[in-house]
Amino acid sequence: MRLLLPFSSPLSATSSPSTPQFIPELPPPSQFDYSGLTKILKKSVIGTLTGALSLTLVFSSPISSVAATNDPYLSVNPPSSSFESSLNHFDSAPEDCPNEEEADTEIQDDDIEPQLVTNEGIVEEAWEIVNGAFLDTRSHSWTPETWQKQKDDILASPIKSRSKAHEVIKNMLASLGDQYTRFLSPDEFSRMSKYDITGIGINLREVSDGGGNVKLKVLGLVLDSAADIAGVKQGDEILAVNGMDVSGKSSFEVSSLLQGPSKTFVVLKVKHGKCGPVKSLKIQRQVNAQTPVSYRLEKVDNGTVSVGYIRLKEFNALARKDLVIAMKRLLDKGASYFVMDLRDNLGGLVQAGIETAKLFLDEGDTVIYTAGRDPEAQKTVVSDKKPLITAPLIVMVNNRTASASEIVASALHDNCKAVLVGERTYGKGLIQSVYELRDGSGVVVTIGKYVTPNHMDINGGGIEPDFRNLPAWDEVKERLSKCSILQQS
C-alpha cells in the first residue's frame, strides 16, 4: 500500500512560545542594509503498489530526510460540560454490521500474519519498487536495462541470511547515486510509522473506501501515549474531533484539530474496525504547542509608513494558523507593507508550506507542480481561496532557505505576489517515498521533484533572488506591477 504522510520536521527545531510572538527589539542582519526598515532578525491517499506500504514524504530538510518533531497546533477549545458528560461510552454499531460475532471477525482480520518471504524475495521486492518509481535526478544514468542486469547478477547466487539480504539492498540502493534513496531496518521503519504530529501519540492516514470516499485511520500508535492509554487502537477510524465531523477532511487538517497546549483535552470519536463499536474518548494532550512565528511592526519614511515584519523559523503544524494571527494583528496595527523572513528556514511540513503560500495567492494560482515517473507523482497544486492580504510583500531568503520554504518563495514570486531578497536558496526540491517491505524493513526512494509555477526545477540550483539588499518599497511595487503585466500578456 502507498500512503501520503503530510508531515516532516526540519533539521533542528527550537522551543518556541505557544502563540505568535510580538518582538520588541530585533538585531539587524549584517548582510542587509535598509535605512527605512531597521533591526530585522536573521532567521494519505492510499493505493496499491507491489504489496508494499509506502509513506510519501512530502517534506524534509536538505540534510535529514526523516526527523521527529513535537511541535503541535494552537489550542482547540475544550468541549462544553454537556458534551463531556457523554464521553467514554459506546455508541450504537453501524447498521451494516449485523452482530458482534461478525464484528469481532472483521477486527481480527486486521491481525492476520503476513506470509513468509525468502531472502531473495525481499531483495526482489526492493528492486521492484525502485524499478517502478525511482526518479533519477542526479546522474541521469539509470536505465531499466542496467537495473535488470543488476538484479540478475545479484540473484544468480543464493542469499543465505536476512542480514545479508539487507546488506544487498543497501548496496543496490547506494549504486543509484541518490543520497536520499536508502534502506531502513525494521526498527527504523517501525519508528517512522509511529511518527506523531498530533500531540496525542497517533499517526493518521487517509484510506479510500472504494466508493470515492476517504476515511481517516490510525496508521501508527505510540506505546503508552495519551491516545494509547485512552483506548485508541491501531486501525481505528476517526469520526469526529471535539464533536466536529471530520468527513472529507485531510489527515493534515484533522491533525491540526487534535493539537493543542499540554494538559488540555481533546475528544476523539473513533470506530474500532470495520464493524466494531463507536466510542468517544477524552484524551489529555502531552506536549506544549510551539509557534514558529514571531512578528513586529516597523515605522519607516519618518513614521509615515507601517511595515509588518514576520519571521518564520520552520513550517511545522502551527505555521499557517499562527501566520494568519500575526498578519491580522499587524493589519489591525496599520501595516500596509509586509516582510516575510524565510532565512535559515530549512523547511518542514510541505503541506504547511503549501497552505501558507495559498494565504497570499489568488484563487486558481498555481502553488507548485510535482513531476515523477509514477502518474500519481505528477500533480498541479492550485490555490482554492482568495488571498488574506494583497499588500506588497518582500520575502527574505538565503542559502539555508530550503524545501517547503522554497515552495513558498517560488509560489509567491512566480505569481507576482512578492519579490525575493537575499541569497540564492539551497535547492532541495525532491520527493521521497518510504515503502515497507514484507519483513518489516523498508526503503526510502526518490520518486519525484518539485517544479515552480514558472516551470523551474528547484533541486540543485535553488532560486535566485530579485535583489541582494532590501529595495525601496516604490521599487518593490514597480517590480510586482511589471510582473503582473507580463503574466497577463
Swiss-Prot record:
Q: Does the keyword Protease apply?
A: yes
One Pfam short name: Peptidase_S41
Gene Ontology cellular component terms for the protein in this record? chloroplast thylakoid lumen; thylakoid lumen
Question: Which stretches make up the PDZ domain?
Answer: 189-273
Query: Which residues does UniProt mark as catalytic?
Result: S403 (charge relay system), K428 (charge relay system)
GO MF annotation, one: serine-type endopeptidase activity
Q: What class of enzyme is it?
A: hydrolase
Its main subcellular localisation, reduced to a broad class, is plastid
Q: Which InterPro entries match?
A: ClpP/crotonase-like_dom_sf (IPR029045), PDZ (IPR001478), PDZ_6 (IPR041489), PDZ_sf (IPR036034), Peptidase_S41A (IPR004447), Tail-specific_protease (IPR005151)
Q: What does this protein do?
A: Protease involved in the C-terminal processing of the chloroplastic D1 protein of photosystem II. This proteolytic processing is necessary to allow the light-driven assembly of the tetranuclear manganese cluster, which is responsible for photosynthetic water oxidation.
**Protein name, entry field:** Carboxyl-terminal-processing peptidase 1, chloroplastic
| Organism per entry | Arabidopsis thaliana (Mouse-ear cress)
